[in-house]
Amino acid sequence: MTQAATNSAGTFAPLRQKVFAVLWVATIIGNTGSFIRDVASSWLVTDLSATPAAVSMIQAAATLPIFLLAIPAGVLSDILDRRKFLIVVQFLLASASLCLLFLSASGLQSVTSLIALTFVGGIGAALVAPTWQAIVPELVSRPDVKGAVALNSLGINISRAIGPALGGLLLAWFGAAVTYGVDVISYVFVIAALVWWRRQVPEDDALAERFLGAFRAGLRYARASRELHVVLLRAAVFFAFSSAIWALLPLVARQLLGGGASFYGILLGAVGAGAIGGALVMPRLRARMDADGLLLLSAVLTAAVMGVLSFAPAQWVAVAALLVCGAAWITALTTLNSTAQAILPNWVRGRTLAVYLTVFNGAMTGGSLAWGATASAIGVPFTLAVAAIGLLSVGFAFHAMKLPKGEADLIPSNHWPEPLTSEPVEHDRGPVLVLIEYTIDKADRSEFLKALARLSHERRRDGAYGWGVTEDAADPGRLVEWFMVESWAEHLRQHKRVSKADADIQDDVRRYHKGPAAPVVNHFLAINHPHLG
């Protein structure tokens, strides 16, 4: 078997698992309906108001809710039944499209109603996105997770190839009401697939997280993960500049290229078709380039496409350029998504992917508004040229900030012993102070502190909100590491969160310990008493 055939088989291997295959097909249908709706709304706003600011507001209305709500949605995806949660949200999205159908059929549609209902659709997307990504490990075996992530991206772009073109044709032939009606029907398939799925619900866990605690834990993890910071920064700069093409494409189609609704759909369909092609050749690209090279290639190609469009080329040239844009877009998106997935443990995946989605959509929202305002001031062609130059500049400038490899073993190690207590401790009691006492030779002190600094990031990622190290004034070789956890339950969760990679870091720290026994660990609980103030 050739390497290409092996790569292809690996790409589609997750579809051999029935539940994943059914939900994957259903999401393609649902996303196709969403793209049909978005094409109708984006084009209708150019009929109602042709100003760049109004057109870019549609893009902003779709992405702003994800920026605002993705993190709370990620928390919900980690603490609720994901299947039931998705079903409720699909009904919300269907209701928004029903309202668009009614307003269009009755002739009451306006820029305000389009933006408002697009915002509601964005709320639904914000609630769905981290949940769909978080359920992937439930649907496939561990070796197939990366392939399933890539297939999710491929599925979205199959929808992007079909939906916009179909939406443009439906809008041109039958009008907005029928177009929105097709979107409503698409949700029926998604809801049916979710109802059919018999998800294995985890048993009730006495340590199950509550919303606010889970929210804080997710933010603590994101704040302490340096690898995630690199992914977020690389994503932010790429999407902030590349968002110009999405914010201004309706105006490019209508004003620069002289096309109608069906041509706009063809342009978006070209993006999707290019993305499908890009997804199919990505295994070969990955064999030749690392993640940083793929992201730089995406930036160069996207900038080139914006440069071509700024010259108002012939329509066929624009279609060809957007085929390239689609391939570049899925390359960047899949590279960043798979990197984020690879560095996140299961317990915090939904929440932390939501942080990534927040940055992604924040960059898209802010970029869309900024490029819309810029186009109002200097025109669409010059704005595209400025965005292209900016994307090239940041692409090369940030290339030296290498993306993480995602090779750490994040499976829970379960190597921490149960804490010793004189009697059972109530789960909500806290805060908890944990002390670990080491005996360190003077010659090893510097290397020990370096290893301990690496361990501090693991402590904070897994739940600590304060961390430090102290020494005994009478015995400088006696060092005490301490960290604070907000409750006893949260500390018990730490025991479950520590990964095998974290265990390796802890082993590196403990090899400097020279005591006759293992480092002594003590747990101190806060005392709440009226005389203590």
Please describe what each predicted stretch is.
Residues 58, 68-72, 79, 83-85, ...:
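C-terminal transmembrane bundle of multi-pass solute transporters/carriers
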Residues 52-53, 142-152, 261-262, 346-355:
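Loop-to-transmembrane helix entry/capping segments in MFS-fold secondary transporters
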Residues 7-64, 220, 224-270:
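Helix-loop boundary and gating motifs at the non-cytosolic
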Residues 117-158:
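Cytoplasmic helix-loop-helix junction between adjacent transmembrane helices
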Residues 42-49, 101-106, 162-182, 251, ...:
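Transmembrane alpha-helix termini and helix-breaking/packing motifs in multi-pass membrane transporters
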Residues 23, 109-117, 230-231, 316-322:
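Short hydrophobic/alpha-helical segments at membrane-entry points of transmembrane helices
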Residues 134, 138, 180-210, 288, ...:
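Helix-loop junctions on the cytosolic side of multi-pass membrane transporters
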Residues 404-406, 457-466, 484-521:
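An amphipathic, aromatic/His-enriched active-site/gating alpha helix that lines ligand/cofactor pockets
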